[in-house]
């Protein structure tokens, strides 16, 4: 009898803790699968922008007439600053031109129409054939569109840990390296100009060049960009 009561107690205790975790993750919503916003989730860590922004597109059911894509530099462009455009900023860290077409197609599907404008920020690193391989876009889309996705996250330890981090950032108003608000606008910690100058001066040319030691120009780079354009004949392209 005592053993049976122990098992019941242990089982109920686990349910209690799992319920608390689920409620907290739902309240914080670190992967943007729900729509509630409040002061406690006002800053969201950019842990996986591909998944988070795909989730936002999939679950929010909004329509846009322009799509913005690019690397981490482009994430800091405020999508609300474009005049006469309703833009969704779908840029993310280490974006590679070869994967952009699949993200555009996913965005068009959620948008339920073609984009009038597709804006792409390109940089030199995108021409590197030997760039690190990113997560397969199909894996991202399959994960986000899984019927159980948003509910699995409620019991995810990673989502729980991320929720705690987001709570800290929101309460302390410290975005860290990069955080987003609930409107998909990115923020970062502002450094004193003298500190920035000091860091730049301390960075050697050799250190910067070492990042390109495996660089090889992708001979198909132009073809990749041409495919993006030909796949979207109803869109006007703005490239910078």
Give short role names for the model-derived ranges.
Residues 44-68:
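Short extracytoplasmic
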Residues 122, 131-236:
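Secreted/periplasmic serine-hydrolase-like ester/acetyl group-modifying domain
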Residues 8-29:
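Hydrophobic membrane-insertion alpha-helices, especially the h-region
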Residues 42-48, 93-97, 214-217:
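Short, flexible loop segments at the rims of nucleotide/cofactor-binding pockets, characterized by
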Residues 28-51:
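Alpha-helical transmembrane signal-anchor/signal-peptide segments
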Residues 49-55, 100-109, 223:
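Short alpha-helical segments and helix-capping/turn motifs at coil-helix boundaries
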Residues 65-154:
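Membrane-embedded segments
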Residues 118, 237-239:
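Hydrophobic/aromatic residues located in beta-strands of well-ordered beta-sheets
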């Amino acid at each position: 009898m005592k053993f049976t009561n122990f098992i019941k107690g242990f089982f109920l205790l686990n349910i209690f803790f799992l319920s608390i975790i689920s409620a907290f993750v739902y309240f914080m919503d670190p992967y943007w699968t729900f729509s509630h916003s409040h002061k406690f989730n006002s800053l969201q860590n950019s842990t996986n922008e591909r998944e988070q922004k795909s989730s936002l597109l999939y679950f929010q059911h909004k329509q846009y007439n322009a799509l913005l894509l690019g690397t981490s530099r482009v994430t800091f462009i405020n999508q609300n600053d474009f005049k006469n455009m309703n833009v969704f900023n779908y840029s993310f860290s280490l974006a590679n031109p070869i994967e952009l077409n699949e993200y555009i197609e996913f965005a068009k599907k959620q948008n339920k129409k073609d984009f009038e404008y597709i804006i792409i920020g390109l940089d030199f690193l995108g021409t590197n054939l030997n760039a690190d391989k990113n997560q397969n876009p199909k894996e991202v889309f399959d994960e986000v569109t899984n019927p159980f996705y948003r509910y699995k996250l409620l019991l995810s330890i990673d989502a729980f840990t991320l929720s705690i981090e987001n709570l800290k950032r929101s309460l302390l108003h410290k975005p860290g390296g990069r955080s987003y608000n609930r409107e998909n606008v990115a923020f970062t910690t502002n450094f004193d100009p003298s500190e920035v100058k000091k860091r730049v001066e301390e960075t050697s040319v050799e250190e910067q060049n070492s990042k390109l030691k495996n660089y090889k120009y992708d001979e198909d780079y132009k073809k990749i960009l041409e495919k993006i354009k030909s796949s979207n004949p109803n869109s006007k392209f703005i490239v910078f």
